[in-house]
Structures are given as structure tokens and as C-alpha cells.
């Protein structure tokens, strides 16, 4: 199941949708979550898929944070894997979804795979936020810092790096594991103070 949350991207969304349609292999569904759009994003999506043989669902959300919109899509998904594709991401690699599944096929303890970037977290001994009582909404929390970055720039094409955190889609997640967690936590944002 491919989850595409969209918020006011009428100028780009046709390229995003076509990238998925032209490069995804095997049986799949697309779940479009229209996230509080005030432009023509929804119309452009329907225009793009109108003549396509595509299994899809559409859900609507008020203008909510991306995590909540993703959860809406996850809960509608039928596949054993769910893939998050952001509304500004154009897929260009044929069979990209099968390639992302390779770590799941090779190991039985994989939770998620990203095609973009992953890293580990370590305690920041110079943190300014540890033991702060107030909730700061003007900066990222610095209690932990990311390290050991694995990106397209520093990781060979055929290497899958193991890290504690994956972010930025496309992001494939084991759907059963996600259900066991009761999906993504919509309130806890460890980096946002």
C-alpha cells in the first residue's frame, strides 16, 4: 500500500502521481490523503488517475500534521507493507518498491526502510534543553543529535545501511508492526520542543 498525503501541491502532484504509476511494480494500491488542501491538488490527482487501471482509496483530513495524515492512510491500507511517499517526491526508478523490500526479504527483524536518509542518535553532552520545564516551540530539541548518516551521497547504491532512525520517504514500513504499535504517535514529537 502506497500512502500519498497531499497538501496544496497542485503544481507538482501530477508528476508525483505519475512517478508512482510509471515505476511501481507488482500489485499495489494507492491511498491518497487529501490534507486540508485549499488549491486544486485533489482535482489534479483525479485528472491524473482518470484513465488509469489503479486500485486506490481517497481519505480527507483537515489541515493536520503529516504524521496524522500518514496514520489515516495506514489505517486504510490493506498491504503487508506500507510506503509513505511525500507530495514533493517524484519517483524515477523502475521497480523502486521491490528494491525497498529487499531488506525485509533478507532479514526478519526489519521495521522500516528508507530510500533517502537514515541515521543514529546519540546524547548531546552540550544540550541546552535537558531538564527545561518550558515547552519551546521555536527550535528543535538538542538533547539528542543525529550521527552516522547514511544518505544517497555517502552510501553505495547496492548497500543497505542499518540505522536506528529512518526518515524522509519513500519510507517502507512493516504494516503488522505498525498496527502492533497502534500506528505512529501523533502527540510525542521528541525533536519539537
Which residues make up each language-model segment?
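Short, acidic, metal-binding catalytic loop of nucleotide-sugar glycosyltransferases
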Residues: 18-27
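A conserved acidic beta->alpha catalytic loop
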Residues: 34-43, 90
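Glycine-rich, basic loop-to-helix element that forms the pyrophosphate-binding segment
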Residues: 61-77
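A recurrent flexible, glycine/aromatic-enriched loop bordering the glycosyltransferase active site
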Residues: 67-68, 141-142, 147-173
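Conserved donor NDP-sugar-binding/catalytic core segment of glycosyltransferases
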Residues: 94-141
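Donor nucleotide-sugar recognition loop
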Residues: 90, 164-168, 179-193
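Short beta-strand/loop segment that forms part of the nucleotide-sugar
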Residues: 27-37, 59-62
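Short aromatic/hydrophobic "clamp" motif used to bind/position activated sugar donors
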Residues: 82
Amino acid at each position: 500500500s502506497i500512502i500519498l498525503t497531499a497538501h496544496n501541491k497542485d503544481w507538482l502532484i501530477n508528476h508525483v502521481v505519475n512517478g508512482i504509476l510509471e515505476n511501481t511494480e507488482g500489485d499495489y494500491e494507492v491511498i491518497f490523503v487529501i490534507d486540508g488542501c485549499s488549491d486544486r491538488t485533489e482535482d489534479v490527482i483525479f485528472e491524473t488517475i482518470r484513465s488509469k487501471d489503479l486500485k486506490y482509496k481517497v481519505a480527507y483530513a483537515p489541515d493536520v500534521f503529516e504524521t496524522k495524515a500518514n496514520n489515516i492512510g495506514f489505517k486504510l491500507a490493506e498491504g503487508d507493507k506500507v510506503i509513505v511517499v511525500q507530495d514533493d517526491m517524484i519517483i524515477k526508478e523502475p521497480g523502486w518498491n521491490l528494491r525497498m523490500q529487499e531488506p525485509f526479504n533478507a532479514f526478519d527483524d526489519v521495521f522500516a526502510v528508507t530510500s533517502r536518509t537514515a541515521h543514529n542518535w546519540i546524547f548531546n553532552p552540550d544540550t541546552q534543553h535537558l531538564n527545561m520545564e518550558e515547552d519551546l516551540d521555536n527550535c528543535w530539541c538538542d538533547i539528542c543529535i543525529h550521527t552516522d548518516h547514511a544518505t544517497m551521497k555517502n552510501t553505495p547504491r547496492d548497500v543497505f545501511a542499518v540505522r536506528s532512525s529512518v526518515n524522509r520517504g519513500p519510507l517502507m514500513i512493516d504494516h503488522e508492526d505498525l498496527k502492533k504499535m497502534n500506528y505512529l504517535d501523533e502527540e510525542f514529537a521528541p525533536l519539537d520542543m
